[in-house]
Structures are given as C-alpha cells and as structure tokens.
C-alpha cells in the first residue's frame, strides 16, 4: 500500500469511526494504518481512545505495552502488560512480554519468574528457552545459558539464533571445539552470514589453526557488509601468528573503512609498540587522539611508548595529562607517581655522583 492508498484508507476508517464510535474494530483498523505509516504517536492516541470504550481489550493492552517497550519506556510498558495480565491471567504472551521487559531493566529474579510463568502455559516454544538462555547469558551464568540453548535446539534444531548464541557460550566456557561445531552448523544453513564467518575465524585463531583461520577471515571479508570489524579481527589474528607486516596492512584497511573510529589506530599502535617500533606506535596513538581528544587512556598509551623508548620526561607529561583528566583513577596516579619518583631518584643520583 503506497502513501496515497494509505491516506485514503485512513480517511475511510475515520469516517467509519464517526458513524460507529463504539465499534472497537474500527479503532484497531485505524491503529494498524497509522502503524504502517510509522505514526506511532497517533497509534497510541487511537489505542488510548479505544481503552475508554473497552478497558479490557487484551490486544490493545499488549500492543500499547509493546510500543512503549520498543520505545525503551519500560515502566509504561509494564503498566499495560500488568493490566493485560489482569484481563487474561492465562495468556502466555503477557508473561513473555513482562519477562522481556524485566530483562531489559536488568531485574533477573522477576524476568526469570515471568519466563517460567510463560513456560507454564507454553512449554514447547523454543523462543522462550532462547530468551531464558539469553537472560542467563547476560548475567554471565554460562552453564545455565548453555542448558537452555540446548533445550531450544532440541525443539528447533535449525534455530540460527540459538546455534550462534550457544556457540558464543561455548567459546566463553573455553570449549572451542564445541563452539566451532555450532558455528559450522549456522554457516552451512546460512553461508552468507558474515558474523558467523568471523566467529569461526576467531575461534580457529584461538585454536591456533592458522590456515583455516585465514581462510575464514577471507570468506568473511568477501561477504557483503562493513569490513571494519573483520579487518581488525584479522589483524589481531595475524599479529598473534607473528605476521606483523600483514597485520599492519589490515589495520590500515580498517582505518580506510572507518577513518572516524579510533580503535584501529589504537590497536595498530599496540602492534608497533609490541615489536618495539615506538615512533610508529606514537604516530598511531596521536591519530587516535585526534578523534578522541579527551580520552585519558590514549595519553597513557603514548606515555608508555615514551617510557619504553627511554623518553622519561615526555612520558611524565603524558601520564600527568591522563591524571589531570581522571584524577579519581588510582591506577593512573600510581603509575605517574612511580615514574616521577624514579626520574627524581635518577636525577639526584647524578647530582650526588657529581658532588663527589
């Protein structure tokens, strides 16, 4: 339906509402058309008018709750979901939506409670088990997350979301071979999935399988989509395998892909610092500083390079800049004080020797 047809449908429905102001079907129809036109303020207004006619319209309560949920107005969402629960305490969608809302609010006990209530009414939906797994995943209980992802897959063996997330959980549990097993399944089902190709490549890198690792990075880069992250991950792998020149070139490609992002410059600087090319490292960090002028950690990185290159006075100035930006950061202060004390001690030692 194009814009012109949509406007005609809206006009026609408004006319029907004028003729039958208590017919809630017309309100649902008008709300649907406004939603198709992305006029969500009008959708809300129509639904609120509908509730004045029928305060127990379950679909309206659920729809309003969902609109506020996706607007990240979680307290407003809960208001309507709670009303929906009073209207129909046996509707699993009510509990599922409440659980999702509490999950966004990081309220683990209530989210888990309402997911379990959802299962009381719908125990065969893999998406509910996925959601519970994700809840445990977010709260870093990877063992429980794994169990629920496996339950989701027992109900839907080709559920791509569960396969990817289960691979991620296995990776975090250091079960890299199992992670690869799930990633490979996804890539077989969706060979154009760039993210999964990267997951496979990164896992192969951890497993020290250089040849296959590089092969999957090349596959990921060849797939459509932004390659900034792919170049960075590939560069890190190249660096880990001591292919430093290739790594440096990949960081350059990452910069070309997104010149306004500092991370590639910082990682490139770290690479040069690790191989003792301090001037090159300094240059990369200063490029990052042009993007994030007020980021104290970059000043610390520059200071570290100066210190390793035996430019102690310059390192002191950079450490002090970081401390001035984050005076509450004890780590910055401790490093600054230690370097300053060492510098003063060396300076005085020279004076004492000269006096003799």
Predicted regions and their residues:
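TPR/TPR-like (Sel1-like) alpha-helical repeat modules
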Residues: 307-344, 352-356
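Position-specific recognition of the canonical hydrophobic site in helix A of tetratricopeptide repeat
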Residues: 28, 35, 62, 69, ...
């Amino acid at each position: 339906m194009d814009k012109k047809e949509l406007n005609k449908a809206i006009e026609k429905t408004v006319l029907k509402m004028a003729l039958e102001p208590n017919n809630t079907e017309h309100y649902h129809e008008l709300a649907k058309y406004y939603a198709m036109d992305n006029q969500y303020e009008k959708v809300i207004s129509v639904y609120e008018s509908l509730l004045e006619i029928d305060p127990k319209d379950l679909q309206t309560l659920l729809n309003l709750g969902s609109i506020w949920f996706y607007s990240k107005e979680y307290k407003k969402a809960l208001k309507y979901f709670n009303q929906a629960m009073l209207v129909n305490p046996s509707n699993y969608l009510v509990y599922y939506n409440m659980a999702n809302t509490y999950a966004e609010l990081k309220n683990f006990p209530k989210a888990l409670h309402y997911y379990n209530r959802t299962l009381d009414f719908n125990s065969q939906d893999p998406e509910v088990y996925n959601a519970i797994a994700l809840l445990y995943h977010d709260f870093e209980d990877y063992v429980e997350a794994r169990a629920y992802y496996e339950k989701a897959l027992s109900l839907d063996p080709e559920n791509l979301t569960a396969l990817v997330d289960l691979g991620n959980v296995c990776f975090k549990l250091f079960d890299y071979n199992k992670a690869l097993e799930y990633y490979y399944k996804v890539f077989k089902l969706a060979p154009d999935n760039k993210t999964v190709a990267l997951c496979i490549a990164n896992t192969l890198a951890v497993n020290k399988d250089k040849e296959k690792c590089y092969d999957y990075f090349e596959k990921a880069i060849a797939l459509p989509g932004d390659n900034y992250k792919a170049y960075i991950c590939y560069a890190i792998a190249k660096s880990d395998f001591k292919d430093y020149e290739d790594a440096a070139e990949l960081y350059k490609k990452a910069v070309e892909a997104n010149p306004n992002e500092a991370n590639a410059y910082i990682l490139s600087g770290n690479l040069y610092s690790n191989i003792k090319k301090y001037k090159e490292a300094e240059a990369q960090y200063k490029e990052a500083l042009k993007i994030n002028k007020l980021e104290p950690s970059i000043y610390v990185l520059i200071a570290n390079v100066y210190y390793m290159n035996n430019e102690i006075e310059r390192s002191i100035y950079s450490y002090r800049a970081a401390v001035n930006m984050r005076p509450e950061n004890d780590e910055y202060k401790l490093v600054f004080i230690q370097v300053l004390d060492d510098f003063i001690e060396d300076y005085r030692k020279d004076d004492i020797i000269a006096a003799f």
